């Protein structure tokens, strides 16, 4: 590969096992830059933004998350049978604009939303690379525009693995408000707000937030109820939620995971959920055939000196892609729903 070719592929370069044969491939050898007429596949879309985290008085640095995720994904083993594309980053934010000069949170979210809509319209399954959890409001806006174009709009559900409800009330949107914003948008559209959160830390959510969650009909499990021994009960919660929806948006906030595994986030968990449990949730979500959109949020490389959080985030993206690749036909099966009575 020439130096020019390596530059064109950005972070997608790494080890090549030349003596291991044609099946010894890694992501950097297989991920393609997204072309307009590309066949349906998995599309990585970066959201290099932490403006919402800053507004929420969190620790900045998640804007560098997408770049760190791609670098870490590059050397993972490739087992895919469905294409994976890289669509670059929403907003095209440079380092000088991270303080919201030329780019505001709302313009970043608007660009991400438009690109999500376009990817869904083209038949792709987008996986967002965050960035702060303000990515969720952006993702929802793009997903909703796609959904309302269906002859019979689907019942959309959001499954969030997160230590926080992110239902805060604030003068302006931030990383702590996306699901309150989504609930309000559902009210405007006369849609039911279908939201399930796994990994809630009781010590990190005020009584007011629990009250709001219950008033909105949010399903949730506490982090202390999501150990390995609780996996059957967690799986039952997820399957019950999936039974009541047609399309799923899965969002994984890294602050739900044990702080020992994921220290590189704005607000590390003191107990958290083990990675194996999150992978089990991913398997169930994809196996339902209802997943249309996913993302991983809150990776902060500046707080991740040994890269363990980036490796875990990359593993979760890898798991998502691996499970989707095993059943692409099922993932696509719900895009045109029959009429319901």
From Swiss-Prot:
Known catalytic reactions: N-formimidoyl-L-glutamate + H2O = formamide + L-glutamate
Q: Name one GO biological process term.
A: L-histidine catabolic process to glutamate and formate
Residues annotated to bind Mn(2+) 2: 162, 164, 253, 255
Q: Say yes or no: keyword Hydrolase present.
A: yes
Q: Which family does it belong to?
A: Belongs to the arginase family.
Q: Which residues bind Mn(2+) 1?
A: 133, 162, 166, 253
Name what cofactor the protein needs.
Answer: Mn(2+)
Alphabetical list of SUPFAM superfamilies matching this protein: Arginase/deacetylase
Q: What is this protein called?
A: Formimidoylglutamase
User: Does Metal-binding appear among the keywords?
Assistant: yes
Q: How is the cofactor bound?
A: Binds 2 manganese ions per subunit.
Pfam families registered for this protein in UniProt: Arginase
* Entry keywords, A to Z: Histidine metabolism, Hydrolase, Manganese, Metal-binding
What gene does the UniProt entry assign to this protein? hutG
